[in-house]
Amino acid sequence: MKNNKYHSHSRRKTPWDEEEEVSDVASFVRDEYRSHYFYHHRPLSETGDSKLLNKFIPQSCPYCHGKKYKRNGHTTYGLQKYKCIDCKRNFTITTGTIFQDHKLSISEWIEYLLNLFGYSSINLNSRINKNSETTSKYWLAKIFMLLSDYQKDIILSDCVMIDETYYSVIKSDIITKDKKKLRGLSKNKYCIGIGCDDQCLYCKLEGKAKTSDTKTVQAFKEHIRPYSHLIHDDEKSHHVLVQALHLKSESYKSTYLSELNDKDNPLDKINHYCDLLKKFLNAHLGFNREELQGYLNLFSFMLNPPHNKLEKVEILLKFALNYRKTMTFRGYYMKNPY
């Protein structure tokens, strides 16, 4: 019997699957829906996956990292197999990557990414691709894993802007006092530090509640080039960063900024990024807040160069085939049963 603990509703089902006689209209709707479903779930032998993947040459054995190996036949869908001379184990170009043992085609993954870059929610993406929500969430977790170190080397320079934006904890985690929500920038909100220059965007989860000297320095110190020009809103903790990195400070009081139109606001650019980030997070309403930094890494990747979505897909696909770390469906949901 199939264990449905980690599986959600199948997109394959229609209301007429068990009925022997249906109306002409129902029959047409069912057949068109099934046609669309099976187009998105073609066997790998009918896709171009193997043709693409066979153009990639392994750098080493994914098991022992030996450099000597030989060709050793093909999989049932035409993917080149190799055998390591040292450890004698068989492998393919996808062994040890997020595509290991994949059942859905890479073209499906491409469409998923394009939808995701267009601010589609997990639910909407699963409907478009005719996948279960658990599958879509699992794919997103794989993307988070790929992008886990994406922002590590981002260094903002020259004219830099920074700000903080806040995002609420999930309803079940809200802290109350005398049955009332805590006021202001309390532990009921996550603090997100955002910085940008003329080229790049950087986003870092600082923790809960209002920012502080320590949080600001930890978030930005390694990601802003010393002696840069910093434009900010005169948040007290920013001045510690200014001193630490010898920045040229251009600050504005919040009361002054609140009276300006967007076009006259010197922080309009960073404010726009804050608004876009909240729009992006709201598209994934109810998401697991433990994955918040994963969403921030993805958001940064989406808004940073290159700006063409197809070029972003190319970058992720190449990286995925060289990133030797995998994740199983069951392993993910045992750790994140949401």
Set out the residue ranges of the language-model regions.
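Residue-level recognition of single "structural anchor" positions
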Residues: 1-338
